[in-house]
Amino acid sequence: MFKLKQLHELIVPWISGINVKIPYLTGLELDSRNINFGNLFIAIQGYNTDGRLHIDDAINNGAVAILSESYNKSTFFIKKIVNNVEVIPIIYFNQLNKCISNIAGRFYDHPSLCLKLIGVTGTNGKTTITHLLTNWTSLLGERSAVMGTLGNGVLSDINPSCCTTCSAIETQKILKQFVQSGVTFVAMEISSHGLDQYRVDSLYFDVAIFSNISNDHLDYHNNINQYRMAKWRLFNELRVKNYVINVDDCVGYRWLLSLSNAVAVTIKNNLPRSWSGRWIALVKADYYLYGTKIVFKSSWGNGFIHSQLLGEVNVSNILLALGALLIMGYSLKSLLYTGSKLYPVCGRLEVLSCLNHPTVIVDYAHTPDALKKILIFAKHLCNKGRLWCIFGCGGNRDRSKRSLMGVIANRYSDYVIITNDNPRVEDPKLIIDDIICKIRNSEKLKIIEDRVYAINMVVSKACSDDFVLILGKGHEKYQNIGLNYISHSDQDIVKSIFK
């Protein structure tokens, strides 16, 4: 349990002099539909809806006070009389969204101060890196938890999440629950949306990891520079003790040179000549269908890891996780001893195989960069047969990457099947038109909107020496068509064919 708070404890010094007596607050809430009696309702203008339109609903549901984003740059206070008896304070607050993380932190006693907390950001790799960190530290005796795309919790009990980075309130609440349950270490995915919307601003990070940046979410950020600057906030504005940077990414290379207390990580011999800080560099990697041998050198010493994870991208992910744990004080010897026990993440380069059938790889790749890297890796393994690629692009999301992904798939695959991948309320045919619009040679291209039929057709038709990549959904257990969520699992479909 934690000590309940009064309103003035949460809003000083931004707001002072409010003399309305209200009960101790029982919780904080951004959604008026979830209000319980005694809650503080925080009403902000969101991306899809405006919470200020639901203040009366929140009061009717039991809210005892309201913090609201102001409609102009001023801050002011009014009293709302309910049933001629109750006085509900409504405080209009300029730039309220920037303060919610701190308000929630105060309410939940800033739980991140009681944890070893690592934040991971980048276009690709966040989920794998956070799960590696959680898995690795669990093997070393920590009670570790993860927060991100696959959900929140200890690895044996992950609760699904609706987004990569939770709201500012939910983030602090979950961290408090972790502390109360004895968790000592947390690895958190931090999305560009989460950074842009100030959801993690009042957390205290031991390490921030940067994996890479490539085209994604430009429907939200408008351009790649705004996307980069959202990511940069984690390294430039928030409370972070140490940094781990992938310097093989040109953005990471530039950022490293302006950071202190950083570890430079490279798998391409790309350390800056002027770099005098800590570092990890790949010496050699041997790639196999069911694992990778990683040989590296570092400012902590040299070593090798026999990993169960596949591909060049996971070599980088493993070394980034290694750098974070080393800079936190975990010993290289213990990390090397446990490194071979790290297991792959569901839906991330997940191999499914069966005698007399093609080798199938299921992955979440949904950006041009991720698509290209997995195709190159699979092409390296597929030296006897043909490479099939099944993928689509999400509806009502960044359109700019669709044609790029079509060209990449067509270039690196022997056969390409374009199918549905969460079309949402967008016309699937228009999504497919965007994907194929810049493909010049379409002889090896086939369009099958029905994803289940596409997978069945390809896996049944492909030869035993072939490789089939099923990309875009990864761990997901649904297909979002229109307003409906239909049960769907790429893995389950493949396994049913293998039976």
UniProtKB/Swiss-Prot annotation:
Top-level EC class: ligase
Name this protein carries in UniProt? UDP-N-acetylmuramoyl-L-alanyl-D-glutamate--2,6-diaminopimelate ligase
Q: Where does UDP-N-acetyl-alpha-D-muramoyl-L-alanyl-D-glutamate bind?
A: L30, S32, T164, T165, S191, Q197, R199
Q: Which residues carry this modification: N6-carboxylysine?
A: K231
Gene name? murE
**Which keywords has UniProt assigned to this entry?**
ATP-binding, Cell cycle, Cell division, Cell shape, Cell wall biogenesis/degradation, Cytoplasm, Ligase, Magnesium, Nucleotide-binding, Peptidoglycan synthesis
List the source organism: Blochmanniella floridana
Share the record's PTM remark: Carboxylation is probably crucial for Mg(2+) binding and, consequently, for the gamma-phosphate positioning of ATP.
NCBIfam families to which the protein is assigned, alphabetical: murE (TIGR01085), PRK00139.1-1 (NF001123), PRK00139.1-4 (NF001126)
Cell location: Cytoplasm
